[in-house]
UniProtKB/Swiss-Prot annotation:
Record's function text: Modifies, by uridylylation and deuridylylation, the PII regulatory proteins (GlnB and homologs), in response to the nitrogen status of the cell that GlnD senses through the glutamine level. Under low glutamine levels, catalyzes the conversion of the PII proteins and UTP to PII-UMP and PPi, while under higher glutamine levels, GlnD hydrolyzes PII-UMP to PII and UMP (deuridylylation). Thus, controls uridylylation state and activity of the PII proteins, and plays an important role in the regulation of nitrogen assimilation and metabolism.
Listed cofactors: Mg(2+)
Protein's organism: Neisseria gonorrhoeae (strain ATCC 700825 / FA 1090)
Enzyme Commission (EC) number: 2.7.7.59, 3.1.4.-
Name of the protein this chain belongs to: Bifunctional uridylyltransferase/uridylyl-removing enzyme
Stretches assigned to the HD domain: 436-558
Annotated segments matching region Uridylyl-removing: 319-672
GO biological process: regulation of nitrogen utilization
Annotated keywords: Hydrolase, Magnesium, Multifunctional enzyme, Nucleotidyltransferase, Repeat, Transferase
Domain remark text: Has four distinct domains: an N-terminal nucleotidyltransferase (NT) domain responsible for UTase activity, a central HD domain that encodes UR activity, and two C-terminal ACT domains that seem to have a role in glutamine sensing.
């Protein structure tokens, strides 16, 4: 590299470092962009002079660099423009110039050609056309640059350009769906991200308006409040993107789990109020994109309407204050929301009631949103406003869209201060994937879908139950309030009771409705916890659950709320296994509340009799049946449900001496039920678990039982790996049975801890602290409940079983609740030694070491 270029490169590095240092000190986005742009242009000037002295060509900045918005590791977008077609010699010259840019580590993205060639190249290329919309002259022949800009502007069909950018934005938003996009969002392309702000400015510039927010304010396209809020949202997002590049040392636009703590720390966020610094960062991010979405929803239709051909305008009178224009509602006088604030909810009420109205007319929306920022205590205390807000839930029609609309524009948070505290609040607990406010609205949506016949095919039984439930509005409110106290520290279910009762008192709910609402908020986790963590075949567990529930109305409401909550937490959590657990508990509790299962001994006797009837129909002699029941023992009927007993009995009754493996695919599910019957021996449970883990199965539930003649009868529910299609299940079943049969007949089975599953980035960088509780069971001497919460990983249950064995603890029952990347396991164990605090402490420490 010539000496003069080496000097220019060194100067560039110094200026770039100075720009970064000034930014980190002053924390001003505009200063960084200005100084970094100047540094790049200084280097480009030297390179241009070296390669194109006295040339007819010109160099233009396009795209983000043309906009004056260069991020630390982004491409430098350039165009080399010629007044005439490029000769071979000029093309070689341009190639050498581009290579020098790479040598200087500028990461160039360069277009080159004549004016006509470049115009033709972007005729059907919306991305290229957009890049040249940002073009600005740098060096060389200015006349050529002006000619290109003029021809581009003449060629561009403004209306078509705007429509194409809006379609592009829709596609971009559609790609930003799913848990990955929520948890590790792309700062640039996510809904409400930087690209949405750019799109707004491109639409403005394409029609001859200013291309920046201050000038759009001067042109009265934006109000002062709109310009201020949009600028604030833009600066927040730009800060995050700059810090992301600086910490990643690459052009990384996704807030990856491993980068979130680094970016948060560099921006000065601290762990506080039991929230991680990364959660604080993500909350700032979600609020910023929400602001951009708010203003985009108002400003984009307004800018579009300035140039788009208007469809035939159909206007209908609604009442003295409102008209319908096509599918939108418009206020006759937009100052009505300031003069008569009760219309802030009235217009939403009309929109909710009318299926032929889908939106507010842009100018009406703008005025309405401006008025909503005046919502205060006086507005809340107005009885008409309270009646209308409660009416949104009583109506049910369009409830999800109504609440999402009110949340997007900040109305829920202004009307209910408790709601404002959860907006954008993300929980790094390895199973929630949405901010709390979005999760709550997803749960409301799920409850509402159960009430609509058009969605009954999704969950037929739950839908039928919901459609016959009298107090649907209370269920919607329970979904709305169930997590409203998240993030305050302490038990959010208990803390939410006060919010729910205050709302009920203020919004004309009866005492009975208030009691049901408060009970559902307090107990919204009860059914999930019992179904997924406890042995519902144990009459004591069922009795305790029913004492909490007390009525069939509460049971039905809790069942419906629980289903909707799980489905709204993380799409991966809802599966046939969880559905069957909840349904089993619902029906068992229903019988218990009706008084049909009040006597445990009668229940156990009925289970035995059902199995005996089956065997009798199969012509099994009574003497043979009796031998089987004696071998299994009376405790067997207390520990297994009827369907398991029938399955076991059919397979064991003819000969219960040889080892047996049986499996069956559970109906409408991606799970197998597996039974293993063999002579008792050391570490059998752990070794069986390792076989399942090596095959990639998740163990959902396990029941370890020892017969009277010292055989194990272990029953597992295992989930088939998601990459397998249902048509593969029989082959998978055969392979699993073959290995298990080899094991039970004494053949050596490898115990290597190898499987293809990898721990996710989220688990590695956002782990949860493992926790263990050991509690004696009151009615059963030497029996203990062990509760474990930890990051999910292969072989976890096998490792836990090894620890139990090493401490002389007998595992009787395991209930595995896998919540995406988090597990909440419940074990019932037997050990006289655990009365000794030292031994109990030793067990706990050993378990923690395995979980670390």
């Amino acid at each position: 590299m010539p000496e003069n270029l080496s000097s220019a490169l060194e100067t560039f590095k110094q200026q770039r470092n100075a720009a970064e240092a000034h930014y980190l000190k002053a924390n001003r986005v505009s200063v960084f962009f200005r100084e970094y742009t100047a540094a790049v242009e200084t280097l480009l000037a030297a390179l241009w002079a070296e390669h194109f002295q006295n040339s007819a060509l010109c160099l233009m900045a396009v795209g983000g660099f043309g906009r004056g918005e260069p991020y630390p590791c982004s491409d430098v977008d350039l165009a080399v423009v010629s007044p005439a077609p490029l000769s071979d010699g000029i093309q070689e010259q341009i190639a050498r110039f581009i290579q020098t840019l790479w040598d200087c580590k500028l990461m160039p993205s360069v277009k080159s050609g004549s004016v006509d060639e470049l115009c033709e190249s972007v005729r059907d290329d919306i991305t290229g056309d957009t890049a040249f919309l940002e073009a600005r002259f740098l060096f060389g022949n200015r006349q050529t640059a002006d000619e290109l800009a003029e021809k581009m502007n003449v060629q561009r069909n403004v209306a078509a350009f705007i429509e194409a950018k809006l379609v592009e934005m829709e596609h971009r938003h559609a790609k930003s769906q799913g848990s990955g996009a929520v948890l590790e969002p792309n700062i640039k392309s996510c809904p409400g991200g930087l690209r949405d702000i750019h799109t707004l400015l491109w639409i403005a510039k394409a029609q001859g308006l200013a291309a920046n927010l201050p000038d759009l304010l001067k042109q009265r396209i934006l109000t002062r409040a709109e310009a201020g809020m949009l600028s604030h949202g833009y600066r927040r997002l730009a800060h995050i993107r700059i810090r992301l590049h600086l910490n990643a040392k690459r052009a990384e636009d996704r807030l990856l789990f491993d980068l979130q703590p680094q970016v948060a720390e560099s921006m000065g966020y601290q762990d506080e109020n039991r929230r991680r610094q990364s959660e604080e960062l993500m909350r700032v991010f979600y609020r910023a994109v929400k602001t951009v979405k708010q203003l985009g929803g108002i400003l984009t239709p307004m800018l579009r309407s300035r140039v788009s051909s208007t469809p035939v305008r159909v206007t209908l009178r609604i009442d003295d204050d409102y008209i319908q224009v096509n599918n939108q509602i418009a206020a006759r006088h937009t100052d009505i929301f300031f003069r008569r604030p009760e219309h802030i909810f009235k217009i939403v009420e009309i929109m909710q009631q009318r299926n032929d109205i889908t939106a507010l007319e842009p100018q009406t929306l703008r005025a309405w949103w401006g008025a909503t920022r005046k919502i205060n205590r006086s507005f809340y205390q107005n009885s008409e406003n309270r009646r209308r807000f409660a009416g949104f839930f009583r109506s049910g029609n369009g409830l999800t869209q109504t609440l999402r609309f009110l949340n997007l524009y900040g109305v829920l948070g202004r009307y209910l201060p408790a709601w404002e505290k959860i907006v954008g609040l993300l929980q790094h607990d390895l199973f929630h994937i949405y901010p709390v406010d979005d999760h709550i609205l997803a749960v409301v949506r799920n409850v509402r879908r159960l009430a609509l016949d058009m969605h009954s095919h999704e969950l037929p039984y739950a839908s039928a139950l919901m459609q016959s439930f009298e107090k649907q509005d209370i269920l919607y409110l329970a979904a709305f309030f169930h997590d409203i106290a998240k993030g305050r520290g302490g038990d959010h279910a208990v803390q939410g009771i006060a919010d729910a009762r205050q709302f009920a008192a203020d919004h004309f709910l009866t005492e009975e409705e208030s009691d049901l609402l408060a009970w559902l908020v307090e107990n919204h986790l009860l059914m999930s916890a019992v179904a997924q963590k406890e042995d519902i075949q144990d009459p004591g567990v069922l009795d305790a659950f029913c004492k909490r529930v007390q009525t069939h109305e509460r049971l039905s409401a809790l069942y419906l709320l629980t289903i909707s909550d799980i489905r709204g937490t993380n799409p991966k959590l809802w599966n046939a296994w969880r559905a069957s657990l909840l349904e089993s508990l619902f029906h068992a509790a229903g019988r218990c509340l009706a008084g049909n299962d009040g006597n445990p001994h009668a229940l156990f006797g009925r289970r035995r009799q059902e199995a005996a009837d089956l065997l009798t129909r199969a012509a099994v002699p009574e003497k043979q049946q009796k031998k089987l029941w004696n071998a299994l023992g009376s405790a067997y009927f207390a520990r297994h449900q009827s369907r398991e007993i029938l399955w076991h009995a059919a397979n064991l009754v003819h000969d219960f001496e040889p080892p047996i493996v049986r499996s069956r695919i559970l109906p409408q599910s991606d799970s197998f039920q597996v039974m293993v019957f063999m002579p008792n021996g050391p570490r059998l449970f752990a070794r069986l678990c390792r076989i399942f883990s090596r095959h990639g199965f998740d163990i959902l539930a396990a029941r370890a039982f020892i017969t009277e003649h010292d055989y194990i009868l272990d029953t597992f529910i295992v989930q088939i790996p998601s990459q397998h299609a249902p048509e593969d299940y029989p082959d998978i079943q055969s392979a699993l049975e073959a290995e298990l049969n080899s094991f039970i007949h004494g053949h050596t089975v490898a115990e290597t801890q190898s499987c293809n599953r990898r721990i996710s980035r989220r688990s590695r960088y956002m782990p949860i602290a493992p926790s263990i509780t050991i509690t004696p069971e009151e009615d059963y001497p030497d029996r203990y409940s062990v509760e474990i919460t930890a990051v999910n990983r292969p072989f976890l249950l096998a490792d836990m079983a090894e620890v139990f064995f090493a401490h002389n603890v007998s595992l009787r029952y395991a209930k595995i609740s896998t919540l995406d990347e988090r597990v909440e396991d419940s074990f019932t164990v037997f050990s006289p030694d655990l009365k000794n605090p030292k031994i109990q402490s030793s067990l706990k420490q050993a378990l923690l070491e395995q979980l670390a």
